Amino acid sequence: MSGLIEKVSILRNDSIHVGYNMSSHIVDEILTKKASSTYVLITDSNIVKMGHLQTFVDEFNRLIPSKRPGSRILTYVVPPGEANKNRATKAAIEDYLLEKGCTRDTFILAIGGGVIGDMIGYVAATFMRGVRFVQIPTSLLAMVDSSIGGKTAIDTPLGKNFIGAFWQPDYVFVDVAFLETLPEREFINGMAEVVKTAAIWNEQEFSRLETYSKRFLKVIRDRRVDDSVDLTSLKEHIIKLVLESIKVKAEVVTLDEREGGLRNLLNFGHSIGHAIEAILTPQALHGECVSIGAVLEAELSRYLGILSPVAVSRLYKCFAAYGLPVSIADKLVQKRTNGKKCPVDVLLQKMAIDKKNDGSKKKVVLLSKIGKCYEPKASYVNDEDLRFVLTDEVLVKDFNSAPSTAVVVPPGSKSISNRALILAALGKGECKIKNLLHSDDTEHMLNAVAALKGADISFDDNGETVVVTGNGGNFTATDAEIYLGNAGTASRFLTSVASIVKPDSNTTHVILTGNARMQERPIGPLVDALRTNGSDIEYLNREGSLPLKIKSGNGLKGGRIELAATISSQYVSSVLMCAPYASEPVTLSLVGGKPISLLYVDMTIAMMKSFGIEVTKSTTEPYTYHVPQGHYVNPAEYVIESDASSATYPLAFAAMNGTQVTIPNIGSSSLQGDARFAVDVLKPMGCKVEQTATSTTVQGPTKGTLKPLPLVDMEPMTDAFLTASVVAAIANDTNQSTSIVGISNQRVKECNRIEAMITQLAKFGVRAKELEDGIEVFGIDYHHLKTPSDGVYTYDDHRVAMSLSLLAGLAESPVLIQERHCTGKTWPGWWDILHTTFNVELDGHEAVVETTTAKANEDKSIIVIGMRAAGKSTLSHVIAQTLKGFKVVDLDDVFVEKYGDIREFIKENSWELFREKEAMIAKEAFKNYSKNTVISTGGGIVETEASRKLLKQQMKDGHIVLHLHRDIEETVVFLSQDKTRPAYVDEINQVWERRKNLYKECSNYFFFSPHCQTEREFFTLKKTFSKFINRITGGAVPSIPNGRSAFVCLTYEDLAPVSSKLTRVTNGCDAVELRVDLLKQHDSHFISNQIGILRNQTSVPILFTIRTKSQGGRFPDDSYEDIERLLNLAIKLGVEYVDLELSLPESLLDSVASKRQFTKIIGSHHDFSGTVKWNNVEWENKYLLALKLNVDIIKFVGTATSLNDNWELEHFRSLHTDKPFIGINMGPLGKVSRVFNTILTPVTHKDLPSSAAPGQLTLKEINEYFGQFGGSSRKKFYIVGKPISHSKSPELHKTFYDEFGLSHTFDKFETDDAAKVFNDLVKGNDELGGCAVTIPLKIDMLKYVNELTDSAKSIGALNTIIPIGDGRFIGDNTDWIGIRDSLHQAGCEIAPESSVGLVVGGGGTSRAAVYALHQMGCSKIYMLNRTPSKLSEIKNHFPSNYNIHIVDSLDAIDEDDKLDAAVSTVPGDKPLDDQLISLLKKLLEKKRGHAVLLEAAYKPRETPIMALAFSRGWKVVPGSKMLVNQGIEQFYKWTGYQFSSHIDL
């Protein structure tokens, strides 16, 4: 068929050509019939990669010499994607055409998908006031939609396709061969337009599409190695579906070229679909959104009484059959869009700017049936009806407008429908089933029968009739799980069917599964009965419930089968229907008490007779049935009567509102027990009931006069008890209630319906109580019904929803009913009946939608999970210290309090019982400690489904569930030495392998904690972890530097061997870039370990970068899944920055960006070629994309081939100021750009093995160059005080300057006169960078500064003066930082509320020591001085909560106190007072654990107090440490550089 060209006429020209492998035809046709001096081929880079452009170029080059000598061809390639369909790209194309001298005879070929077709068509429409062009669509969507009809456009930031023109192409060449290289998802995406077009215009083609869906998906999913597909077996179908779709659009366009009305019909599904797309783009594709929109617009048609429920069901199933989503809630849509919400108000706003609208009036294309629209144009619709269709909650308003009479035909009986499908599939021959219920339940049954190859299924009468051609009971196993949702009937019937399934060559079993509720519902008695009769059935999860694994080939032995049927009659019907296919006749005996719902068993027996098998009841044994062997013979036609359970709702409506309702096709001859509802329930309550053999009419009494029923046994119609309950709720008699019995089976339906009804009636102010096998309802006057404040919860149960909707319209104000879509199980159109037949006003409602913007954690509790020995207990306390006011609750400790020692409990009981109790404790703790608590859990909490559900619910409720982990080998070593905890049953590595994915799914943050070998490493880790906690809780969101800053680019393949270098390498940088692509491994564990090593060594913010090959890195360009996995891991690890390459697919970019939480996103783009100059449109397009993604920082890197490239970059920078911008050029000529870049310049370091990019400089080099260029001024710094001759400060700060290439100076200014310092050094000195203040001026200088930091105010002394401009100065105190960091680095542990500190001395530094110890968490501080009176002044200076105790005698020391930290601030070179030594010795003897003493004096190297402390087991820290640490803080305050390297003075 490759040589056959089909031509379609549009606007009276045969200009649409459809065929296969048409390149030669296309070029020959153009050259023969369209003369031009210049043929311009325009496409995108994706089409170039596939070789399509070159094919056309070669063909032109072959034919031009003979066909058009003297003509030329030009090619232009644009970047792919919707982001490039804009004014800038259009202008660049036009500039190119002008530069090449193109004139009005230019002929353009637009080769590509919809983006290319739309944009290049618009170029053709406007270039030289319009030139000729052809559309050569390469995607299915473009072939059947955008290429046809002459619509051309570009996008703007305010919306898609807002600027464009109608400009008809000379040709549209549709070469179906292009589809061989179309990715699967794009193929399926295009099918949305195909199905939509058939739905509005061509029912015959729609029916054909329905039959081809399975073949279609099978072929397009069978991919070659290069991801292409062989369409040979499907070629005719593909060409036909393309042709038929094109013919419809061509006909419509011919009749209405400029969209006067008829052409609106092509927008079926687009009014709502475009609104959804505007929110979910780019993760959701156009066709996917149109599919969802079409289903919703069809539901709108049904809601308005225009379209039949069967037609909606067909449309729904057809879209779904082609792999398209049919709901925003679709799991794949949710996954792809990261759960992005589509708020109804936003959708309506988006719909308000639809081009079809008339001003503010919205218009939607409505269907009247498959293949025909309601009007020859879009129809007006109101927001109320749209709001209803778009939401899953409904506000039911009053019933005051109810008609006096109504006729309602409920959908087919669910019970009969499911039985008829099973019997027809078991039978032989064709059976036309009419009035089948089209619902979720029957859909699951149809799918299951088809999956097991039990029958061929087709549709007649526009889908109203289901044609089942049974295979005589020959079912075949399938390797795919059969998912049954919450369809209890289907699950029970199919369990017996699965027992008679035959194996195929690949599969020897059938797996039946369902949703979470289905996996709780009972099926045990049926399984027991089948097992005893030879079936091999295995429970895969919970004993007694789905999922089941049923071995094929065993069949049923037959003979006597005993079955307990007190819970469900469906067990009985299931066995009965399959019994004829047993190896011998079956005698089925029901045991264990009176069976439930025997009328349904009678129904089954009657239906079996209709299909040729007669069951006889035993005359000697009760509840026993004899089933002969045989085969069902299908009747030619079987009509399903309407569902009697569903009929109870409109009949009850009449009863409760005093109106008349007739059900025309259910009467006394019905097979269904619920048909007796009107006679047995409503009539005794005061209704007039007329029932014939085939119809039922109810006339309700005057509203409010219903009578209660003292006792009614509803065992024959248990499902109808909910309807009876709501009628009883307004049967008002203070002396009488209504008791309904015989309904105990309703406790194990979709929910516990008895409990549900009691709970929900209470919301209306109606009291009800539970009976042993029923419910008692105490009715009230309907005028006194309350409006449920939080609405009616339906438990996802169709019968709860429909029954309570009857009560809702009688309440005093509108009632909210949640999860209204659950009625789709049996009556999808129930709300339509309320609205159109009963004239009830309904309004859609939506709960407040949480935004995706990251929210601060505030007081929400944090749950910590992870393996044993991961550091949960230790780090939980760090969390509590970080988040002031939080406490720690360890669930292992709670367990011990309740049940005793864990090891003993497991030994005496079992691991299973331990896990059960653990889950109960967790549930209780999550409820009782929901605020201000860190909840540390046991390592195995993720082992059980119950606990996992709890953890996932915590995440849904906005809590942080933090997974802590450390290197597993270190864990093995630690646990092998720990004898206090129960031994693992399995090896630790095996436990980790089993749990690691469970931890992943149950946590929203992850922290990897490598082994700390030194106290400094542990200090750094705790500091970093504290910052991590502050960040993920929103307490300290990383701020983007607003001045000169840099990040160092690591180029190691593994950080472990070089970890000791990391502190030095990151010195002075504002961030450190982990180049993930350069690492030797890319698994999550290795990457997490690398992050952990970084956090062990430095607290510098981390930039996580995956640089792909095309962007100058090593990561494979097309490994999108791995890229997304690792980027998501980075966000879960809470890194400060993530680099997102703007060349990645837009859907991936948007997905990652939407999950950012508190991580900052850097949108980057690199050009290594040097050919993309700074005036190239590519930079502009990438910048617009970055803005659209709302990245936090934009990073563009070009390549300089001349110095002028740097000045072009600066010009680009000056014009693009919307976001912080990193802009540099690579290469030797681009070095100057690195000097002039301000924010986060990438730098290298001399200790790195290589630089990350050509021309990269060190931080020192950049500062030196910047200073030489005059970019920074030289500042003068001083230390002031007396004596300072031996001060180490000048040496310290000069070390800093040298490290960072700064030209500043640091000198001594010795004086004890504060006024002299101010007048001679500070006042009017523009060169002053700052002053370090030492004794005796720390207090005296306070009056010479304009402001004080909080610490300086609290301490009452300063040691740092910082100029802030305009002759103003801030006073700060960094001594306390020096003290705090020195103690921390030495491993000093301070436990809030229990730690005790000591300060020796009474000078200015002692104040800083008091402040430091208090900030660290000391609850009591002792002070000791040779002159105790001086200490009173200090004590009085600080607030009382500092809890300062002056030690002037031994009596002042509490015997119970243990000291954790001490600071000596007395001069180190002066003798100590005997009294002081005596008291100090006593205090030093009262140490706790690893107590640390810091000596503030750094001369001499070892002071007497250090010696005293050391001799008593204290760890002592020399004063030089404090000097360095406070100096580092001073240097940071003055220059903005954080010095992190080790310094010895």
From Swiss-Prot:
Binding site for NAD(+): 44-46, 82-85, 113-115, 118, 138-139, 160, 178-181, 189
Segments of this protein annotated with the region Shikimate dehydrogenase: 1274-1545
Pathway(s) the chain acts in: Metabolic intermediate biosynthesis; chorismate biosynthesis; chorismate from D-erythrose 4-phosphate and phosphoenolpyruvate: step 2/7; Metabolic intermediate biosynthesis; chorismate biosynthesis; chorismate from D-erythrose 4-phosphate and phosphoenolpyruvate: step 3/7; Metabolic intermediate biosynthesis; chorismate biosynthesis; chorismate from D-erythrose 4-phosphate and phosphoenolpyruvate: step 4/7; Metabolic intermediate biosynthesis; chorismate biosynthesis; chorismate from D-erythrose 4-phosphate and phosphoenolpyruvate: step 5/7
Residue span of region Shikimate kinase: 859-1049
Gene3D superfamilies associated with the record: 3.40.50.1970, Aldolase class I (3.20.20.70), Dehydroquinate synthase-like - alpha domain (1.20.1090.10), Enolpyruvate transferase domain (3.65.10.10), Leucine Dehydrogenase, chain A, domain 1 (3.40.50.10860), NAD(P)-binding Rossmann-like Domain (3.40.50.720), P-loop containing nucleotide triphosphate hydrolases (3.40.50.300)
MF terms (GO), sorted A to Z: 3-dehydroquinate dehydratase activity; 3-dehydroquinate synthase activity; 3-phosphoshikimate 1-carboxyvinyltransferase activity; ATP binding; metal ion binding; shikimate 3-dehydrogenase (NADP+) activity; shikimate kinase activity
Positions bound to 7-phospho-2-dehydro-3-deoxy-D-arabino-heptonate: 129, 145, 151, 161, 193-196, 249, 263-267, 270, 286, 355
Enzyme Commission designation: 4.2.3.4, 2.5.1.19, 2.7.1.71, 4.2.1.10
Cofactor(s) listed: Zn(2+)
Residues holding Zn(2+): 193, 270, 286
Active site per database record: 259, 274, 822, 1166, 1195
Biological process, per Gene Ontology: amino acid biosynthetic process; aromatic amino acid family biosynthetic process; chorismate biosynthetic process
Keywords (A to Z) from UniProt: Amino-acid biosynthesis, Aromatic amino acid biosynthesis, ATP-binding, Cytoplasm, Kinase, Lyase, Metal-binding, Multifunctional enzyme, NADP, Nucleotide-binding, Oxidoreductase, Transferase, Zinc
Record's catalysed reaction(s): 7-phospho-2-dehydro-3-deoxy-D-arabino-heptonate = 3-dehydroquinate + phosphate; 3-dehydroquinate = 3-dehydroshikimate + H2O; shikimate + NADP(+) = 3-dehydroshikimate + NADPH + H(+); shikimate + ATP = 3-phosphoshikimate + ADP + H(+)
UniProt-annotated stretches for the region EPSP synthase: 396-840
Keyword Aminoacyl-tRNA synthetase found: no
Region feature 3-dehydroquinase, mapped onto this chain: 1050-1261
Residues covered by region (3-dehydroquinate synthase): 1-383
SUPFAM superfamilies: Aldolase (SSF51569), Aminoacid dehydrogenase-like, N-terminal domain (SSF53223), Dehydroquinate synthase-like (SSF56796), EPT/RTPC-like (SSF55205), NAD(P)-binding Rossmann-fold domains (SSF51735), P-loop containing nucleoside triphosphate hydrolases (SSF52540)
CDD domains given in the database record: DHQase_I, DHQS, EPSP_synthase, NAD_bind_Shikimate_DH, SK
Positions bound to ATP: 866-873
The UniProt record lists the keyword Chaperone: no
Summary of the function given for this chain in its UniProt record: The AROM polypeptide catalyzes 5 consecutive enzymatic reactions in prechorismate polyaromatic amino acid biosynthesis.
Protein name in the entry: Pentafunctional AROM polypeptide
Lineage: Eukaryota, Fungi, Dikarya, Ascomycota, Saccharomycotina
